[in-house]
Amino acid sequence: MKKTLLAVAIGGAMFATSAAAVDFHGYARSGIGWTSGGGEQTALKVNGGGSKYRLGNETETYAEFKLGQELFKDGNKSIYLDSNIAYSIDQQVDWEATDPAFREINVQFKNFAEDLLPGATLWAGKRFYQRHDVHMNDFYYWDISGPGAGVENIDLGFGKLSLAVTRNTEGGGTATYGQDKVYYIDNNGQIQYRYEDRKADVYNDVFDIRLAELNVNPNGKLEIGFDYGNAHTKNGYHLEPGASKNGYMITLEHTQGEFFGGFNKFVAQYATDSMTSWNTGHSQGGSVNNNGDMLRLIDHGVVQFSPKVEMMYALIYEKTDLDNNQGKTWYSAGIRPMYKWNKTMSTLLEVGYDRIKEQSSGKKNDLAKVTLAQQWQAGDSIWARPAIRVFGTYGHWNDKFNITDRTNAGYKAKDAEFVAGVQFEAWW
């Protein structure tokens, strides 16, 4: 309740300042679905994977509400306050209460040093920082978002430089030389005690350097990034033996504009040790299970075959090779063609395939899904939103490892499911 009142108070204060000047942006989706096996809509995702092809395959109500306002303006200089509160619920009943997530609250000072760094922006606070993603499967492959600070868009003449630092904290990842007596009940119902090391959080800082808008060919631009993650603790505490402590990630992304009426992005990334847990740019230096490296290649984009037909596509290869032999390789491919009947009605087909290969055994888990959707949207672009869609989704999987993850959920290791439903999606 306190968090809800805080959100209302922030929104009210911003509107009270100057209602006409407040920017309101956001994202939302919700709907209803049924599963052939009975019950509510089931999400179809490969066993061991972190992403799924999303058309006709999202089972939650999710929303982000962004309020922002320019608080200062003097010539080319301006100060902007931005905020973002997000909600996620299971879309099961009428009244579903949840605590909001305070995803963003930051201030951006544009042209803060106009004479020295024209066009550059100084910022501080919690922020979605220059995120890069594959829309089809909601996969954010370069995302260091969190509390932080930085200077971005420093014009070097041949490109733009951005510098930032953000933080993500691991709970209970360190120990101290002190111990606490912990009581527990044994298998015979007797009260026993043992001594356990005191735990404290691990603080992971990520230092981010990006050089963007490098013109390398006609309508083609290159972005280069280096992220270094480093863990530190409070005085008197230490990382667990074998903890990765630090690591780095290198990213190269080439964006080709005017590509068959759309665009193409090719991405190559390499990460080590603490940067391999999430494989996105966040660091987990307190972990003892992420020593190793990761290589990822992505090709994704949108093409327009005719005024009536557009298509999204994605190809992903990601290999995480860990010293403890617990890594995996992820293969993914998907397409989403769209046929436009008119400016506000279209038909979409999404075909997606994911495979996870276990490092230790070489065994593989596979999942393929196909979705057919009839859609009504605000415009004739594949990016047009809001949209309301009626969909049917068929998924088939075949698991060879971690089978209990599937069977404990009431499914067979090799099985299939059909899902149908209605969903809206909007961004503004």
UniProtKB/Swiss-Prot annotation:
* Localization: Cell outer membrane
Record's Gene Ontology CC terms?
A: cell outer membrane; pore complex
**Signal peptide positions on this chain:** 1-21
- State the similarity comment: Belongs to the porin LamB (TC 1.B.3) family.
The keyword Ion transport is annotated on this UniProt entry: yes
Q: Which reaction does it catalyse?
A: beta-maltose(in) = beta-maltose(out)
Subunit structure comment from the entry: Homotrimer formed of three 18-stranded antiparallel beta-barrels, containing three independent channels.
Q: What is this protein called?
A: Maltoporin
The principal localisation class reads membrane
Q: What is the lineage of its organism?
A: Bacteria, Pseudomonadati, Pseudomonadota, Gammaproteobacteria, Pasteurellales
For this protein, the record's HAMAP family field holds:
LamB
Q: How does it sit in the membrane?
A: Multi-pass membrane protein
Q: Which InterPro entries match?
A: G_neg_Bact_CarbUptk_Porin, Maltoporin, Porin_LamB, Porin_LamB_sf
Task: Spell out the molecular function terms from Gene Ontology.
Answer: maltodextrin transmembrane transporter activity; maltose transporting porin activity
Question: What species does this protein belong to?
Answer: Mannheimia succiniciproducens (strain KCTC 0769BP / MBEL55E)
Per the UniProt record, which residue ranges are transmembrane? none
Q: Name one GO biological process term.
A: monoatomic ion transport
Q: What does the protein in this record do?
A: Involved in the transport of maltose and maltodextrins.
